[in-house]
Amino acid sequence: MNKLFKNISIGFESIKSNFTRVFLTSIGLTIGIFTVSIVTAAVSSIDKEFAKSIQSIGNDKIYVGRMPWSFEFDWWNYRNRPEIKEEQLEYINQYSEFITQSSMKQNYWTRASYENKASWLQMNGVYPNYGEMLTGTKVVNGRFFSENEWKLQRRVIIVGGSVREGFFEGKNPLGKKIRLGGVSFEIIGELEKTGSFTPTGSLDQVIIMPSTTFQRILTRWTWNEFVLQTSPDNINKAKEEVRLIMRVARKLKPEQEDNFAVNSADAFTKQFNQMKIAIAGMGLLVTGISLIVSGI
């Protein structure tokens, strides 16, 4: 027994004499383990959200806009690009061999209100066939607007899942009227809530209306893009074809650079993978430093 107490005493004396080293080793190991756990959890969570986003974008969709989807957003190089115009979509529909469906999509943030509640939401003005092109979500309550409602510029809207929760506290929103920028609109449909976010915005926080109605009530600047559908097998051919058609439609000379961007899920995936590598690299750096400090 005396020998046991003696060994314990020697151990405590050793710890006491090397307290700083033991302390740094413990702290270093703790930080290292904590960092690895946090980075692993973060990457896993991002992967799940990204999978939802990719589903919402669609692997058969092409998005034509003024700016590329990039985490390294260079606003100053893109801000003076000419707007995307509807007549350019007509060019694509006329000359493309790979595009099977298309829709104009106009975007604008506005103040939405219902009774004593208000929120800023994204308005989308689209064609009637946009409802058929939606991926990753669907109309789960009510319906999409019709060709006739589009032609007659009806004030009807389809709302994202979060709009129902925010304005109606889970109650059925169909038939209710929301004011957008002071103009009253009737809700005829509700989108399934996805929880996803894409470079084009969250479908949970969106209000969709006929593009004709959108253009009638909004004469100010809006952010426009084309949503084009093709076969997943032809996505790269379709992107290059659309790029060439857009150059003609925008009257660009051979030596001039593109003043528009042709985006798709694969480009977004590439950007996302680069971001994941950067996050993992930072985690490894912090872990490495902590292990060096701990003397391992």
Predicted regions: what is each one?
Residues 1-33:
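N-terminal Sec/SRP start-transfer signal
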Residues 65-66, 83-144, 262:
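Short amphipathic beta-strand/extended segments in non-transmembrane regions
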